[in-house]
């Protein structure tokens, strides 16, 4: 009995070690977004609360927590309240299979890629439930847009994943990282460049980020699926969006950029200098790079029209992935490096 309780406590501690830093990362990602976009637009960004505005995320959280939760009169109250949790939970439980470095993973399962792909796709159910339960036409339009967008881009994302599985020969995330050993030139983003770009574009669309933020297009459908949410409900949707961004960036770093591996492997003098850097630091740097690109894209590109969004998904991304999957399959069968 005591042994079982001890195991349970240890599992809870490991979960908290992942979730607490993740929630803090989400808080400061919002701060980084406002700062980065501010500098791109030749503004300063938040600079009043704390040193250089570093306490701004906590001020925003306090504001949202103290706001009144308003439930629309004819809405489905139970689904309305629970929908933000449906959106948030998948972006948190996906971290169970993320390897931070060799052996440092909560659950080292053989179907890690499949599990993570499923978790990254489940968030759309929260969006759909929120749109329907709100009893608002704007919320419903936003939810339908988001659902159609996710279904469209999941296909391209799934095909891009298959390319990595063919090249690495495993669905275990640790094995996929180990298959990229040998330095930056051995990372999968080089031989699978078209699939890498498609996966990245589909990842932006999956998380409803600009320029694919049709689900919450302010100029067309007010705030989209969360137009009726205020206070903590809105905060949970906000949290789920940024947590999903971090999860997709981590997925990208593991699949295509060598995960925790150093980019200087194979370059003797640089490898000796950076040998002391822990693997998880390299992973965090790669995640930070992808998150910066997220913010850069948001500040640079205008929002797509809905028909353009669908056309890009079905007529461009899916054909590209199918063609490159055929190429990858032929290279693997022919034992051509670095595909094999």
UniProtKB/Swiss-Prot annotation:
Functional summary from the UniProt entry: NDH-1 shuttles electrons from NADH, via FMN and iron-sulfur (Fe-S) centers, to quinones in the respiratory chain. The immediate electron acceptor for the enzyme in this species is believed to be ubiquinone. Couples the redox reaction to proton translocation (for every two electrons transferred, four hydrogen ions are translocated across the cytoplasmic membrane), and thus conserves the redox energy in a proton gradient. This subunit may bind ubiquinone.
Family of the protein in this entry: Belongs to the complex I subunit 1 family.
Enzyme kind, highest EC tier: translocase
Keywords associated with the record: Cell inner membrane, Cell membrane, Membrane, NAD, Quinone, Translocase, Transmembrane, Transmembrane helix, Ubiquinone
Bilayer topology: Multi-pass membrane protein
Entry EC no(s): 7.1.1.-
GO cellular component: plasma membrane
Membrane-crossing segments per the record: 4-24, 78-98, 113-133, 151-171, 184-204, 244-264, 273-293, 316-336
NCBIfam families named among the record's database cross-references: PRK06076.1-2 (NF004741)
Cited Pfam families: NADHdh (PF00146)
Annotated GO MF terms: NADH dehydrogenase activity; oxidoreductase activity, acting on NAD(P)H, quinone or similar compound as acceptor; quinone binding
The protein, known as: NADH-quinone oxidoreductase subunit H
Gene Ontology biological-process annotations: aerobic respiration
Subcellular location: Cell inner membrane
Protein species of origin: Legionella pneumophila (strain Paris)
Superkingdom of the organism of origin: Bacteria
Reaction(s) catalysed (UniProt annotation): a quinone + NADH + 5 H(+)(in) = a quinol + NAD(+) + 4 H(+)(out)
Subunit structure: NDH-1 is composed of 14 different subunits. Subunits NuoA, H, J, K, L, M, N constitute the membrane sector of the complex.
Gene name linked to the record: nuoH
């Amino acid at each position: 009995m005591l042994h079982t309780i001890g195991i349970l406590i240890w599992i809870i501690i490991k979960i908290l070690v992942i979730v607490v830093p993740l929630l803090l990362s989400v808080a400061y990602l919002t701060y980084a977004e406002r700062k980065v976009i501010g500098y791109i637009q030749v503004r300063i960004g938040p600079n009043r609360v704390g040193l250089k505005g570093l306490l701004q995320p906590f001020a925003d959280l306090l504001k949202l927590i103290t706001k009144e939760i308003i439930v629309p009169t004819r809405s489905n109250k139970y689904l309305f309240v629970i929908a933000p949790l449906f959106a948030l939970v998948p972006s948190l439980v996906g971290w169970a299979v993320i390897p931070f470095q060799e052996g440092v993973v909560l659950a080292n399962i053989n179907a890690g890629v499949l599990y993570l792909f499923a978790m990254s796709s489940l968030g759309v159910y929260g969006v759909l439930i929120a749109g329907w339960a709100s009893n608002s036409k704007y919320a419903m339009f936003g939810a339908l847009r988001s659902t159609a967008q996710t279904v469209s881009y999941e296909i391209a994302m799934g095909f891009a994943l298959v390319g990595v599985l063919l090249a690495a020969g495993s669905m275990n995330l640790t094995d996929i990282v180990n298959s990229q050993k040998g330095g930056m030139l051995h990372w999968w983003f080089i031989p699978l460049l078209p699939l890498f770009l498609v996966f990245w574009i589909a990842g932006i669309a999956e998380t409803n980020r600009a320029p694919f933020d049709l689900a919450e297009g302010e100029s067309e459908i007010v705030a989209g699926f969360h137009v009726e949410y205020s206070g903590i409900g809105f905060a949970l949707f906000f949290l789920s969006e940024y947590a999903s961004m971090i999860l997709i960036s981590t997925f990208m770093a593991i699949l295509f950029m060598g995960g925790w591996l150093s980019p200087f492997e194979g370059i003797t003098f640089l490898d000796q200098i950076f040998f002391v850097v822990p693997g998880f630091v390299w992973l965090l740097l790669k995640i930070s790079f992808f998150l910066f690109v997220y913010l850069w894209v948001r500040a640079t590109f205008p929002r797509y029209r809905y028909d353009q969004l669908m056309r890009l998904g079905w007529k461009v991304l899916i054909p590209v992935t199918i063609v490159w999957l055929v190429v990858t399959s032929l290279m693997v069968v022919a034992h051509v490096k670095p595909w094999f």
